[in-house]
Curated annotation (Swiss-Prot):
The gene is gltX. It holds the Pfam family tRNA-synt_1c. It catalyses: tRNA(Glu) + L-glutamate + ATP = L-glutamyl-tRNA(Glu) + AMP + diphosphate. ATP binds at K255. The keyword Cytoplasm applies. This is Glutamate--tRNA ligase. A motif ('HIGH' region) lies at residues 11-21. A motif ('KMSKS' region) lies at residues 252-256. Its EC number is 6.1.1.17. PROSITE patterns: AA_TRNA_LIGASE_I.
Length: 485
């Protein structure tokens, strides 16, 4: 076993980075940082049918955006490369031949139709379907007969019979599997390309991976991988299987579940902050010491340990993520919040792609009003709607305020004060509200609510004089006149 801690994240380039994959990458990264080890990023691209163009680049971009940096990979190299499975085919071929020569693997000529018929018969008998072992002990003559018919074989691993495979899992403790429940499994396809379970074992061994940290869904692969390690006479790494991630309804998360946003790139596009996503994912199945919930990447790395990774399922609480992102937005520099929110106003057609200096200052001021309450960048479009239209619709709650008997007097008094202003700024508007209070004798809610509702259309909102200033004199006075008429 390698004395140095070496961990890896090995995604398949089949699409965007899923939040489950992002959590696995993060746990590996944090463990490596905590232990002074190395974090390897490897691309498992042997399943050519499922690979998606540009997915490799998107995976790397999403990890970089999160701040999860690797020590060795396809882009930075390293002494244990290549770091892409399809560039390692000669290495796998050599190891498959070794198992064939030692009688630990064999060629299987069963067709898909034969395997399906076998499977259906087993299910009909109430048995767990597994490969029967028909081609386990073929003679050379039988093999030649199949090949004469043009049947291309797969390579299967010969699973030892009557064994108990014990795994000391760093999260779950001892986990046992019966080898008799596992049929001889395929380690190489008909074209010679290895299956995932084989390639991952060869790669992890040759890259000196000390700890395999991944999600619970991989636990069922582990006995197959352990048997391969033992067949080669290699040390088995330490396995650590983190808990399943459940959706907010406490059901197992499915990539087809559209009720929840599941890909890192989507959160980026919505205007979430990478620091918040990292913080949230770290707490999804790992618990720090104490009650604190807000951590930087460095603070997480300083605390992270496998002992505090939970085996109980973790619920992906979207409200908690929105709350956490808001904590980061509240504490961010205003320029960073503008960079997060402004593109969404431009994309929605509220502001032009190219802003004048005056427009940029105005947009910054509007966004600043919502920094305290903004949950993610795209939310700014809905929050700031009142700044981008002349006429506003008053909902029932707003209409109730406007129906109060003191309202006409308050609004006409306020309109008069605004029209008399020489300068249009928050201080002057605050003065106009005070003057209206003096002239009408109204104060508190009786004064402020009608003014807020009439000028913004909302019963709650940002600091009022600043909002009125940014809406603009022409639109504000028009709204007041429309109501009074």
């Amino acid at each position: 076993m390698a004395s140095e801690v070496r961990v890896r994240f090995a995604p398949s380039p089949t699409g965007h980075l899923h939040i489950g994959g992002a959590r696995s990458a993060l746990f590996n990264y944090l463990f490596a940082k905590n232990q002074g080890g190395m974090f390897v990023l490897r691309i498992e691209d042997t399943d050519q049918a499922r690979n998606v163009g540009q997915a490799k680049e998107k995976l790397l971009d999403s990890l970089k955006w999160l701040g999860v940096e690797w020590d060795e990979s396809i882009d930075v190299g390293g002494e244990y490369g290549p770091y892409s499975s399809m560039e390692r085919l000669d290495i796998y071929k050599k190891h498959i031949e070794q198992l064939l020569n030692e009688g630990k693997a064999y060629y299987c000529y069963m067709t898909e139709e034969e395997l399906e018929a076998e499977r259906e018969a087993q299910i009909a008998r109430g048995e767990m379907p597994k490969y029967s072992g028909r081609d386990r002990d073929l003679t050379e003559e039988q093999r030649r007969a199949y090949e004469a018919k043009g049947i291309k074989p797969v390579v299967r691993f010969r699973v030892p019979e009557g064994q108990v495979i014990k795994i000391q899992d760093a999260v779950r403790g001892e986990v046992s599997f019966e080898s008799d429940g596992i049929g001889d499994f395929v380690i190489a396809r008909k074209d010679g390309v290895p299956m995932y379970n084989f390639a991952v074992v060869v790669d992890d061994h040759l890259m000196k991976i000390s700890h395999v940290i991944r999600g619970e869904e991989h636990l069922s692969n582990t006995p197959r991988q352990v048997m391969l390690y033992e067949a080669f006479g290699w040390d088995v790494p330490t396995f650590a299987h983190a808990s399943l991630i459940l959706n907010p309804n406490r059901q197992k998360m499915s990539k087809r579940d559209e009720s929840i946003i599941q890909f890192v790139e989507q959160y980026k596009e919505l205007g979430y902050m990478p620091e918040a996503i990292v913080n949230f994912l770290a707490l999804l199945g790992w618990s720090p010491v104490g009650e604190e919930e807000i951590f930087s990447l460095e603070e997480l790395a300083a605390q992270f340990s496998l002992e505090r990774v939970s085996k109980a399922p973790a619920v992906f609480d979207t409200d908690k993520l929105a709350w956490m992102n808001n904590q980061y937005i509240k504490n961010a520099d205003l320029d960073d919040v503008v960079a997060l929110a402004l593109p969404h106003l431009q994309k929605a057609g509220k502001l032009p792609e190219s802003l004048s200096e005056e427009q940029a200052e105005w947009a910054k001021a509007v966004i600043s009003l919502y920094q305290e309450q903004l949950h993610y960048g795209a939310e700014i479009v809905e929050l700031t709607e009142l700044f981008f239209k002349t006429e506003i619709q008053y909902n029932d709650e707003a209409q109730e305020v406007l129906n109060e008997e003191q309202v006409p007097g308050v609004l006409s008094g306020f309109l008069q004060e605004l029209e008399g202003l020489d300068t249009w700024d928050a201080v002057s508007i605050k003065g106009a509200i005070k003057a209206t209070q003096k002239a009408t004798g109204q104060k508190g809610k009786k004064l402020f609510m009608p003014i807020r509702v009439a000028t913004t259309g909302q019963t709650h909102g940002p600091e009022l004089p600043s909002a009125i200033k940014l809406i603009g004199k022409e639109i504000v006075t028009h709204r007041l006149r429309s109501l009074l008429n």
